[in-house]
Design a protein with these regions (language model features):
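Vicinal oxygen chelate
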Residues: 2-22, 44-96, 105-131, 143-150
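Short, contiguous, helix-prone interaction/anchoring segments in small proteins
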Residues: 26, 32-35, 41, 47-49
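Conserved active-site tyrosine of GNAT-family acetyltransferases
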Residues: 33, 37-38, 108, 135
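Conserved Rossmann-like nucleotide-cofactor binding loop
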Residues: 103, 136
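Short C-terminal beta-strand
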Residues: 139-141
């Protein structure tokens, strides 16, 4: 293979050509996490996984999540241990850009999302954060009218 197709039209899992990007979350309970992303965001569970090491695969809009329990080093990652984050020490988070933040806030809250705060204005956007059962945060944001990136 001399090149990888980046501008593809389909992002199925597993990919038939090119590649698909997924976000991996180390979780305490695979089924609980998969159900949260299904219920709150309308995700589609491709594989439910289990607590014995079989990961769950969830499609949310144009993104894939992989959820799996943590664990110690393995042959393919001999110096790495995976664990759920400490509740208030996060090094990365998922970002969801929406067209109507107030509607998303109300809908997702009614579906069980635990928001840290109500939507707040900041710079050229309105944003808020959801905390999932394992302590991950999910940023939800909407651009202000006339605000553009770049």
């Amino acid at each position: 293979m001399n090149q990888v197709q980046v501008e593809q039209k389909s992002y199925q899992m597993p990919p038939h050509d090119g590649f698909t990007v997924a976000f991996f979350l180390t979780v305490a309970d695979v089924e609980r996490s998969a159900r949260l992303y299904e219920t709150v965001f309308g995700g589609r569970i491709l594989s439910g996984g289990d607590s014995n090491g079989l990961p769950g695969y969830i499609q949310i809009a144009n993104t894939w999540l992989i959820v799996n329990v943590g664990g110690g080093p393995t042959p393919e990652k001999p110096s790495v241990t995976l664990s759920v984050p400490e509740a208030d020490k996060i090094s990365s988070f998922m970002h969801i850009r929406v067209a109507d933040i107030q509607a998303c806030y109300e809908l997702w809250r009614s579906r069980g999302a635990e928001f840290i705060t109500e939507p707040k204005d900041k710079y050229g956007e309105t944003l808020c954060y959801i905390r999932d059962p394992d302590g991950y945060i999910i940023e939800v944001a909407q651009n202000k009218p006339g605000f553009a990136f770049g």
